[in-house]
A protein has these predicted regions:
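Q-loop/switch helix immediately C-terminal to the Walker
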Residues: 73-85
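Conserved ABC transporter NBD signature motif
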Residues: 37-45, 205-207
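Helix-to-loop junction immediately C-terminal to a conserved catalytic motif
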Residues: 29
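Conserved beta-strand-loop-alpha-helix hinge in the C-terminal portion
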Residues: 202-225
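ABC ATPase C-loop
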Residues: 138-139
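The feature captures the beta-strand-to-loop junction immediately N-terminal to the Walker
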Residues: 14-16
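H-loop/switch region of ABC-family ATPase nucleotide-binding domains
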Residues: 182-183
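ABC ATPase NBD coupling module
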Residues: 45-59, 67, 89-92, 96, ...
Length: 226
């Protein structure tokens, strides 16, 4: 498989179960090591590098809201952990008034009331609130590549729409290069400038711009059945 993601691309990746979507994402993230070939992120060869090493440039939001946050810690403490890449921060630093105010401002942008729950343990948040927090944490450092691993699949339809709208707003505002794995054809068609279909470990379709905008769900369903 040869795939180049250009800076600023928002790529939706679709495919049947077992097509290779998760393998592709896990290889980029570093949880799987390819048998051959080379992988570069932001100009750095990372083929054999660890997840921790790649985290300098790559952030990931998982399908399970619990995986991107620490449930026993407060909302503010989770945000402090997410800022570890920007410098050495104490978990107690959030108690400072200026830190709390900044966090409240960030959380208010999510429109989920989390700005009023800085000291609440994350395990008491709803799935949508927790996933929104995960998304905020993953993008605090403005990563070179944001990986979204079916990040709305565990949410109810309304919350899924809210998190997707939030995703688009953050990606657009920060001009983030993004790869989103999704089973929802409507999301794949609605969001992003590029759509990639994976089948049997190969790229079956790769469209962008106006060509993507012209696609209909029926077109994609036809490709799935081929």
């Amino acid at each position: 498989m040869n795939l180049t993601i250009e800076p600023g691309d928002f790529v939706s990746v679709i495919g049947n179960n077992g097509a290779g979507k998760s393998t592709l994402l896990n290889t980029i993230a570093g949880t799987l090591t390819p048998d051959a070939g080379e992988l570069m992120v932001a100009g750095h060869r990372v083929t054999k590098r660890s997840v921790a090493y790649r985290s300098r440039w790559v952030s990931r939001v998982f399908q399970d809201p619990k995986m991107g946050t620490a449930g026993e810690l407060s909302v503010a403490q989770n945000l402090t952990l997410a800022e570890k890449h920007t410098g050495s921060l104490s978990l107690r630093r959030y108690r400072r008034a200026d830190q709390a105010k900044r966090y409240a401002t960030l959380l208010a942008s999510l429109n989920m009331g989390l700005e009023h729950r800085l000291t609440t343990q994350v395990k008491y948040l709803s799935g949508g609130q927790r996933q929104a927090l995960s998304l905020l944490m993953a993008t605090l450092s403005q990563p070179q590549l944001l990986l979204l691993d079916e990040h709305t699949a565990a949410l109810d339809p309304q919350t899924s729409k809210e998190v997707m709208a939030l995703t688009e707003a953050i990606v657009t505002k920060q001009h983030l290069t993004t790869m989103m794995i999704t089973h929802k054809l409507s999301d794949a068609l609605t969001y992003g400038n590029r759509l990639v279909m994976v089948q049997d470990g190969q790229i079956k379709l790769d469209v962008r711009g106006e060509a993507k905008a012209r696609l209909q769900a029926s077109d994609l369903m036809g490709l799935f059945s081929d």
